[in-house]
Regions:
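Basic, Gly/Ser/Thr-rich N-terminal segments that form RNA-phosphate-binding interfaces in CRISPR RAMP
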Residues: 1-268
Length: 268
């Protein structure tokens, strides 16, 4: 549709974003501003609503193809002598991964696949989560922990691949926080420079919108030392349940039910 806009009444064309639009462009490159060049909160919310409605452009057919491609790639690794363990993870509620990835105009944080723009759990996050749990349950300076995760001098023996949607699109959920005492939090933040303002009931809540996901993800671990890949998988299963992945785990986000798939350990 068309509508008059601007001080001269110029006509602008308004159309709904396609569900096939690139989420990498929309969430990482687009800056929605008003006629004064100021970032527009309403347009930012519209981008987030598009992400929820379109599921970040996830195509069931393409997801199936990517899953098949990964299966073939893992089969090649097995043929080369690698051990491969395949896991399936499902959030107990919602998952907030990549909220700190705010290198975009509207500071929308979410981990996205670098090619397709789908939600993922980065392999680096899975490795860090597993290493944190391993450190809790192992002796200090454990040789197994050092071998599996590496050190400053040597890389680890197990590779944690990015977790991708497990055969079907993940559900994208637009969530919201409502901090009630923003002046207090702002004035007491490091380097605020001003006098602290006490929290008070007359402070208005300030809604903060962010994206979360739910649904099954495929987790894959590979390595040449079978026992070490198995150990990493066991630690990851426990870490997902005990520590949770991503942000806001103290609020119930990120806890994962991780299970092993039936035919995962064939290797050459």
């Amino acid at each position: 549709m068309s509508a008059p806009a601007g001080p001269l009444g110029k006509v602008i064309r308004i159309s709904e974003l396609s569900g096939e639009a690139s989420s990498l462009i929309l969430l990482r490159r687009v800056a929605a501003v008003d006629r004064h060049g100021v970032l527009d909160d309403k347009s930012e919310l519209a981008l987030l609503q598009w992400a929820e409605k379109s599921r970040l452009g996830q195509s069931p057919e393409l997801i199936q193809r990517v899953a098949q491609r990964r299966t073939r790639a893992l089969a090649e690794l097995r043929a080369l002598g690698h051990t491969v363990i395949r896991l399936r993870a499902e959030p107990e509620w919602r998952l907030a991964v990549g909220l700190g990835n705010r290198a975009n105009p509207h500071e929308i944080g979410m981990s996205l696949h670098g090619t397709y723009g789908w939600p993922i759990i980065p392999g680096s996050s899975l490795k860090g989560l597993t290493a944190a749990w391993a450190a809790q349950v192992s002796e200090p300076g454990s040789g197994a922990v050092i071998r599996i995760f590496g050190s400053t001098d040597k890389r680890g023996s197990v590779r944690f691949l990015d977790a991708i949607p497990a055969g079907e699109p993940a559900t994208v959920v637009l969530d919201v926080l409502t901090p009630h005492h923003q002046p207090y939090y702002t004035s007491t933040a490091p380097k605020s420079g001003g006098a602290p303002r006490p929290p008070a009931e007359h402070h208005n809540p300030v809604p903060v919108h962010f994206l979360t996901v739910t649904g099954a993800f495929a987790l894959d671990l590979t390595g040449r030392v079978t026992n070490e890949v198995r150990q990493a998988a066991e630690w990851l299963i426990d870490a997902g349940d005990e520590l949770g992945a991503g942000a806001k785990t103290t609020s119930g986000y990120g806890y994962l039910k991780v299970s092993r798939l039936g035919d995962e350990e064939r290797h050459g």
